UniProtKB/Swiss-Prot annotation:
It comes from Desulforapulum autotrophicum (strain ATCC 43914 / DSM 3382 / VKM B-1955 / HRM2) (Desulfobacterium autotrophicum). GO terms for biological process: translation. Keywords: Ribonucleoprotein, Ribosomal protein. The gene is rpmD. This is Large ribosomal subunit protein uL30. Belongs to the universal ribosomal protein uL30 family.
Length: 60
């Protein structure tokens, strides 16, 4: 697990439960179509796996 991940929010948080909202905010995403880069590690991958319906992930 090396390299970086490009994570983009593609779905809105309206109507989502609080746990999913907190995960998205913890990743640093604040609005739709916003993109952030994180290192590829187990903590980040665990967060992404809980909200695959809200984000897209690409390796950089």
């Amino acid at each position: 697990m090396s390299g970086k991940l490009k994570i983009t929010q593609v779905r809105s948080l309206v109507g989502r439960n609080e746990k999913h909202r907190r995960i998205v905010r913890a990743l640093g995403l604040k609005r739709m179509h916003m993109t952030v880069e994180h290192t590829n590690n187990p903590a980040i991958m665990g967060m992404v796996k809980k909200i695959p319906h809200l984000v897209t992930v690409e390796e950089v």
